[in-house]
Amino acid sequence: MKPIKVRNGIPFYYDKSDSEFRMDVYEQYDTTVLKNARRYLSGNRVSESLNYLVNCIRQNDESTVIVENGCGIGYHTAMISKEFGDALIFGFDLSYQMLSMAADLWIHKKKSTNGTLTAFFQKHGLSLDVEMLDQTPKMQLALAKCEKLPLENEMVDISYSCYLWDRIMDSKNFVLEQHRILRTGGYLIVLGPMSFTNKTAWETWYPFAKLVAFVQDLGFKLIDQSSWQEKDVFDGRNNHIAWQVEGFCFEKV
């Protein structure tokens, strides 16, 4: 599919309006993008979510095309690419600033970006994991809605999202789109703290048996459900938020 436009190397498959840019907190570089980088790129970074993804993907007989929905700054996209080096990895997000950071870090290797991050990390008593950034993953980044991806039917083996479910506005069409792009036997992996911010979401998805039933009714079966605690470290003194993360691995039937 041909993109609507390309901005600094990032193809757009969704025509994001000026007002949408202004209203999107994930387009705020200082308050959101840098904090997202702090979560994943310091020596104190989270790792259990990555471990869960890798373990689930390894269980699938074929993992040659992998999609991350809501890839942010590309940490999981890059690490999955490193782990499964022969696979084609797509990272989609609706934030241009997040995608731009991901491209600068993993594809363009911009030293100025590393310098900005180093200064930000040092301000909080942390250090940037420069060695990790030496990776050169094989991944493609694009701005797109996860409910309408620029991919052909049944071309994907693994589709996953991290810390996204409680932010999706249209969960039904999100799951239906994952069902469309996944081959039969492909995996849909969803994980996150499920920290819902309104009464309706809590009533809809919690307890999690409701979420599982919802996804299964749309053409999947649950093959794994796990939970773990993950620290989001703020500074060099290890001040942090402890997230209670839930992970689900579904197979398309």
Task: Identify the role of each PLM range.
Residues S63-G72, F90:
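Conserved class I S-adenosyl-L-methionine
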Residues G185-P193:
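Conserved beta-strand signature within the Rossmann-like core of class I S-adenosyl-L-methionine
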Residues M1-D24:
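N-terminal auxiliary segments of SAM/dcSAM-dependent transferases
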Residues K172-T184:
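A short glycine-rich, Lys/Arg-flanked "PGG" loop and its adjoining helix->strand segment in the class I
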Residues S95:
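Conserved SAM/SAH-binding beta-strand->alpha-helix loop
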Residues I107-A144:
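S-adenosyl-L-methionine
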Residues A144-S159:
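A short acidic, Gly/Pro-enriched loop at the edge of an enzyme's catalytic core
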Residues S42-E62, Y75, M79:
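Conserved alpha-helix/loop element of class I SAM-dependent methyltransferases that forms part
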